[in-house]
Amino acid sequence: MRGNVYLLWGATTTGKTAFSVSVAKERGWSVIALDRFQGYHEISTGSGAPTNNELEKTERIYITPQRGLADGIITAKDYNYWLKSRVLSLPEGKSDFIIEGGSVSLLKEMVSDEFWADFLWEIKIFRAPSKDVFIKRAKRRITDMLHPEDGRPSIMDEVSSFFMNHKTIHPLEDIDGYRTIIDYCRCKKIGFDKLKIMTTDQEKIIISGIAEEYYAHALWQEQETPCFPHSWSRRW
């Protein structure tokens, strides 16, 4: 048995990150993000990566290759490979950790890999609340992405900067949140380098659109969550 893993699984806005910080502080464990996007600095705001203040001095590890987002998003297969390498490199006495996230593709890759059977698992699943509650929470979070108070660029700034630096918005259009912004700009013929001129009403439309996108994705995540294999020893 290699060590203990506490998996915190669920959709966005369900409280996983805050809970992971609480557990990390209590147990002294690191948190590994089960997310293919949060490790890219170009999209730290819109991907939902927690701020340093939110992490409260706990360690959060991102499994991201040493390349930029323009070179493509890490695949689930590659993520699993690098995650295993990272776990095997943990120092003796620090082999217990938390995995927190909601990526279906990553979890499916892990449950099909016998490597992960050699751990003692504790699993907590965060269910999406009612649609009204979810949308309210999501809108609050998206508003913070549009107007961050921690010095980070807004999600709009991230779209503009990526477009101006690379003359493309791929692969942003494949990511929740960014997809809604890009589709809206195309529909309204707004240049990706002109997002600072968005009106309050336009922002409200985008916020509502992203919230609905998040909710639809949350329902899909719950439907597509793979079964945990019997080979995973677990404590519930």
From Swiss-Prot:
GO terms for biological process: cytokinin biosynthetic process. Keywords: Cytokinin biosynthesis, Transferase. Its EC number is 2.5.1.27. The keyword Transferase applies. Pfam families: IPT (PF01745). It catalyses: dimethylallyl diphosphate + AMP = N(6)-(dimethylallyl)adenosine 5'-phosphate + diphosphate. One of its GO terms (molecular function) is AMP dimethylallyltransferase activity. Belongs to the isopentenyl transferase family. Transfers dimethylallyl groups to AMP as part of the biosynthesis of cytokinin phytohormones. This is Adenylate dimethylallyltransferase. It comes from Pantoea agglomerans pv. gypsophilae. The gene is ipt.
